[in-house]
Regions:
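SIR2/sirtuin-family catalytic core signature
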Residues: 2-7, 12-13, 18, 22-45, ...
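Active-site-proximal helix-loop elements at catalytic-domain edges
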Residues: 75-88, 162-185
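Short, flexible loop segments at the rims of nucleotide/cofactor-binding pockets, characterized by
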Residues: 87-95, 182-191, 263-266
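Amphipathic coiled-coil/heptad-repeat helices and related helical stalk/stem segments
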Residues: 95-98, 192-196, 220
């Protein structure tokens, strides 16, 4: 979810598990009334003993919902949209501090616009809402025939667009939704797919600041590598979280490592240096942060110059 998780939207695994629970509940796997608690237990056990990759799980869900006809396809899109927004943790504001700092960065200054475009891999419309609240003229682009004017800041949804209020947008039926494995395969195979061209053009012609991206997407890495062949020095920047020795020693399970702090520090120094070199090969320089709350502060400093 990246940036969107700061506004309380579910991460990918939570969204997929919820869709799977919803699908099985409709088929009465939890008993005659489709008890969601029982279904959740079934799903949890499935993930435990035979957990597929997230892309395979998404394909499994799409197949389970029998998406074939246009009506079924729309039902599938509606199901994803409903789960995406209904699972939002309401204790977080829709315009989080991070989203707000991104919108501020897009606000033109006396010398002109600092941001040429936004490329998002998320389905939601939270960036658009933040731009709208600031009366910033923009255009959501989610299919190849949409062309923003010179006055509009383009917001490219290269993996698809699922706004909460679909009535505000037209031609959403022409949107390519990269949700499951076959969607990735389609874009990977088609070098001239509009989303590939938009990304490649941005990587070649602009300096990109990557926020909330793990940079593990094979297609994204492929496009960055292609673009990097025409530059001598990295011109893009990506936020990456630096591991501290304290967190590394504690681990996710909370069981501390019985290794000296000096050894861990030396390993992490090499680990971070290696990651920096790997990113340099893709034309990307790393901006390290330790806590997620650091990112808005850094963005505000960039805006202030």
């Amino acid at each position: 979810a990246g940036v969107s998780s700061s506004a309380g939207l579910p991460d990918w695994n939570t969204l997929l598990n919820s869709l799977l629970v919803s699908m099985l509940s409709q088929e009465n796997f939890g008993g005659p009334h489709g008890d969601p608690v029982k279904v959740s237990e079934i799903v949890a056990r499935l993930m435990e003993v035979d957990g597929p990759s997230t892309l395979m799980l998404a394909r499994y869900i799409r197949k389970g919902l029998a998406v074939g006809s246009p009506v079924e396809q729309q039902g599938f899109v509606d199901a994803i949209t409903h789960q995406l927004y209904s699972l939002r943790d309401k204790k977080f504001p829709v315009e989080s501090e991070l989203i707000s700092s991104i919108a501020k960065l897009c606000t033109p200054t006396r010398t002109g616009a600092n941001v040429k475009s936004i490329l998002t891999y998320n389905f939601d419309d939270f960036i658009e809402r933040a731009l709208l609240s600031r009366s910033l003229v923009h255009k959501s682009v989610f299919e190849e025939f949409e062309t923003p004017s010179a006055e509009e800041l383009p917001v490219y949804h290269v993996h698809g667009f699922l706004p909460e209020d679909r009535q505000r947008y037209s031609n959403l039926d022409r949107c390519t939704l990269v949700f499951s494995e076959e969607g990735y395969h389609q874009i990977y195979r088609d070098a001239y797919h509009w989303s590939n061209l938009v990304q490649l053009n941005s990587f070649k012609e602009s300096s990109c600041l990557m926020i909330g991206l793990s940079l593990t997407d094979p297609n994204l890495r492929r496009l960055l590598e292609i673009a990097s062949k025409s530059i001598e020095e990295p011109k893009h920047f990506a936020f990456m979280r630096r591991l501290t020795s304290k967190k590394f020693m504690a681990g996710a399970s909370g069981k501390p490592l019985k290794i000296s702090n000096a050894v861990v520090e030396r390993f992490l120094e090499r680990h971070h240096a290696t990651n920096e070199e790997l990113m340099r090969e893709l034309g990307v320089s790393v901006i390290w942060y330790e806590e997620y709350g650091d990112i808005p502060e850094i963005l505000n400093k960039i805006r202030a110059g």
